[in-house]
Amino acid sequence: DLVNSNETQDEIAAKWNDKKLNESIKLFPKECVYMRWNYKDATQPGHQRILQWYHDKGLKVMGATAASCGSSPFIPRENSLAGYIKGFSKLVAQNQLEGILATAWDDGSPHSETVWRGYIAQGEYGWNPTARTVEAFKAAHAQREFGFHPNDNHMAFLDELEQEAFFFDDALVNSGRRN
């Protein structure tokens, strides 16, 4: 919970015992590229502190976010995680990290097409983290991938499907009788 806390630097330093960490970090190889994984909201204050600490210590670090992760049994959620990807990409630029990549750690769907929009979002925001809004990205994706005119709103069904997927998870997986 230190990563997501709003505690001061001194309070966190006391819990982390960062004097020892600051001494030990000198032993880490400088030629390595270290990965910082975060599949959800990377803009939390603690996570920002960690990225700044890496930068201050001179470590080469890449960000790693997800186009899909374990909460996606058959389709990605939360606009293919585009908001999280955008937020982490901004932090990568601000902290002058080595770059960012998106992974898909979910084998819940046999169709790789279900994660393509997340990968494309990583391309969008990895190159330009201050690019268009997530809604504008979704409209551009629909036009470029499928030829849909943005005003036709043909992709609105995806937003509805994402919301229904949460019901599907609870209705058929958590408890009770399935049949």
What is the predicted function of each stretch?
Residues 1-179:
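Substrate-binding groove of N-acetylhexosamine-processing glycoside hydrolases
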